[in-house]
């Protein structure tokens, strides 16, 4: 029997408070992280993801406190990411109570960090976040765009971005997904920058291509505005988990409602 699909609220944390932006811009305050996480835990979340987008050292210290407070009353897997740059950052997050640590920019700049962390803490603790955006294929990218797609507007590829989705790098997202699996990552957190915050649905094509390319679990992220979008990403892209923020933070749907919607449409989920 196939594993149950996971529903994961994402909490973007800045200076100890939860915020949510549209396409990584225009942040809104959505409350206390530990309280929100506990609310989602009680209402059937399968996991929690904290992404720390603080810029200051003080914000980073506040994040450790958030993780510690959350771990005292939330008993589902918790992933922490944002600002992770070395093995000591992994250790700090795990010691505070995280079950998994998500790394993005530092992994692109130093891929050996993935294997180093996996060797020390185990692959199950290592999540590589991949932020990807579809871009028109230009001649200067043909040597790095290993996977090329086309539509009525022409050819395009999925490009990796770092530093919170602000900075493009010459790296094909599907190639990078394969590489992080080889290096020992236990899971991929895949965000479509195009879809993030729009509430118009996940990027099915991007998610499907990455899921087909790797054997480790893939969490789809970016664009969820309705439970039907989760049905699509599970059935059409075969994602292992769906991450969402806006639809939960502002009370648009409860996790119970989402799971009921999925179950009615034949998607296996853990019941609340």
Swiss-Prot record:
EC number per UniProt: 4.3.2.10
Gene3D superfamilies: Aldolase class I
InterPro entries recorded: Aldolase_TIM, His_biosynth, HisF, IGPS_HisA/HisF, RibuloseP-bd_barrel
Subcellular location: Cytoplasm
Pathway the protein acts in: Amino-acid biosynthesis; L-histidine biosynthesis; L-histidine from 5-phospho-alpha-D-ribose 1-diphosphate: step 5/9
Catalytic residues of the enzyme: 12, 131
GO biological process, one term: L-histidine biosynthetic process
Location, primary (coarse class): cytoplasm
CDD domains recorded: HisF (cd04731)
Pfam families with a match to the protein in the record: His_biosynth (PF00977)
Disulfide bridge map: none
Keywords: Amino-acid biosynthesis, Cytoplasm, Histidine biosynthesis, Lyase
A GO CC term attached to the entry: cytoplasm
MF (Gene Ontology): imidazoleglycerol-phosphate synthase activity; lyase activity
Family: Belongs to the HisA/HisF family.
HAMAP family the UniProt entry points to: HisF
Subunit structure as annotated in this protein's UniProt entry: Heterodimer of HisH and HisF.
Function recorded in the entry: IGPS catalyzes the conversion of PRFAR and glutamine to IGP, AICAR and glutamate. The HisF subunit catalyzes the cyclization activity that produces IGP and AICAR from PRFAR using the ammonia provided by the HisH subunit.
Stated name of the protein: Imidazole glycerol phosphate synthase subunit HisF
Taxonomic path: Archaea, Methanobacteriati, Methanobacteriota, Methanomada group, Methanopyri
């Amino acid at each position: 029997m196939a594993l149950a699909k996971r529903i994961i609220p994402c909490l973007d944390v800045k200076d100890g408070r939860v915020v949510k932006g549209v396409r990584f811009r225009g942040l809104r305050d959505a409350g206390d992280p530990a309280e929100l996480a506990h609310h989602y835990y009680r209402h059937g979340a399968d996991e929690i993801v904290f992404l720390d987008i603080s810029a200051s050292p003080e914000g980073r210290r506040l994040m450790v406190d958030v993780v510690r407070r959350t771990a005292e009353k939330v008993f589902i897997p918790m992933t922490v990411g944002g600002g992770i740059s070395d093995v000591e950052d992994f250790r700090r997050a795990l010691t505070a109570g995280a079950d998994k640590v998500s790394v993005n920019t530092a992994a692109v700049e130093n891929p050996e960090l993935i294997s180093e962390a996996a060797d020390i803490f185990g692959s199950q603790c290592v999540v590589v976040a991949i932020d990807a955006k579809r871009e028109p294929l230009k001649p200067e990218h043909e040597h790095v765009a290993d996977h090329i797609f086309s539509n009525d507007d022409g050819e395009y590829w999925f490009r990796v971005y770092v530093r919170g989705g602000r900075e493009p790098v010459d790296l094909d997202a599907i190639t990078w997904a394969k590489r992080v699996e080889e290096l020992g990552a236990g899971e991929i957190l895949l965000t479509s920058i195009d879809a993030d915050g729009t509430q118009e649905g996940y990027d099915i094509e991007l998610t499907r291509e990455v899921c087909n390319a790797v054997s480790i679990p893939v969490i789809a992220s970016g664009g969820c505005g309705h439970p039907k979008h989760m049905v699509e990403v599970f059935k059409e892209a075969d994602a292992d988990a769906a991450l969402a923020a806006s639809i939960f933070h502002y009370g648009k749907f409860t996790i119970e409602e989402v799971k009921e919607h999925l179950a009615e449409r034949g998607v296996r989920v853990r019941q609340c």
